[in-house]
């Protein structure tokens, strides 16, 4: 499962090498998980699954302990970050794009989402299979990107996690 992250590292290395060899002003943006209004209803990522459960009034069922922690970024914030990097970033530098205030575990995110539509009356359950390893879930990890370097260019995330979910759920509800 690490091929995705390793692939990103290789591409970043190739860009840096090409930039040095051919004097191209490459700037790298490392985006955290990004979402917001407009995500497809059938998107397979965990944040979309949680939103669908809220919309459909189904309990959120976790098949792990939900201890993995990540940071997230709202789509529009990600776009403004990319524009900031293009306009003000230094060639040869990498910038993390994330809202550092959104760091949350999968379990706590499920709890957050379960309370966004109180009328749904959904709960968070854990149904951890005995043969968990055979399901291919990522190991528990903490992925907290630090966007301080990007903020020093004048960028600031504007949408928090709860509002990200409120907008996502509203958007997904329109197509459900």
Task: Outline where the language-model segments fall.
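Active-site loop-to-helix junction immediately N-terminal to the catalytic Tyr of the SDR YXXXK motif
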Residues: 1-3, 17, 42
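Active-site helix of classical SDR
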Residues: 3, 7-10
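Short coil/turn segments at alpha/beta junctions that flank glycine-rich nucleotide-binding fingerprints
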Residues: 7, 21-25, 88
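Hydrophobic alpha-helix immediately C-terminal to the catalytic Tyr-X-X-X-Lys motif of short-chain
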Residues: 10, 14, 18, 50, ...
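Conserved beta-loop-beta element that borders a ligand/cofactor-binding pocket
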Residues: 12-37
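Short, solvent-exposed loop/turn segments at secondary-structure boundaries
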Residues: 38-42, 137-139
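Amphipathic alpha-helical segments in well-structured domains
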Residues: 43, 47-48
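C-terminal substrate-binding subdomain of Rossmann-fold SDR/epimerase-dehydratase oxidoreductases
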Residues: 54, 58-176
